[in-house]
Design a protein with these regions (language model features):
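Ribonuclease/tRNase effector modules and their secretory precursors
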Residues: 1-107
């Protein structure tokens, strides 16, 4: 069953967010805060689904950070907790101008 942004928004709070080790490194490298991730979920749309991710299904969300800058966040969930898998500012060398569509040559 695909994840729904409305369900993610309902559980999106500091008490329900876990940050993976990989995500912690990426957030620090990119200057991204957990507040930016919350903003992304609250303002964003799911643009890719990863239903077979382990240990929980995940999805890629395109939303805005707290400074209203587009951001991508991969969020896994068991519908009780949100796990931040990674987050980054989308790069136009890998994404079309809509920031929702991967470029063909991206692997």
């Amino acid at each position: 069953m695909p994840l729904k942004i409305e369900a993610l928004r309902e559980i999106c709070s500091l008490e329900n967010i876990e940050v993976t080790t990989h995500a912690a490194k990426r957030l620090e490298q990119g200057g991204i805060s957990v507040g930016d991730i919350i903003s992304c979920v609250k303002t964003g749309k799911i643009i890719e689904q990863y239903p077979t991710d382990y240990p929980f299904p995940s999805c890629l969300i395109l939303g805005m950070n707290v400074k209203n800058v587009p951001i991508h966040a991969v969020i896994g969930t068991n519908l009780e907790t949100l796990w931040i898998v990674t987050a980054y500012f989308p790069n136009l060398s890998k994404w079309e101008s809509d920031l929702k569509t991967r470029k063909e040559n991206d692997s």
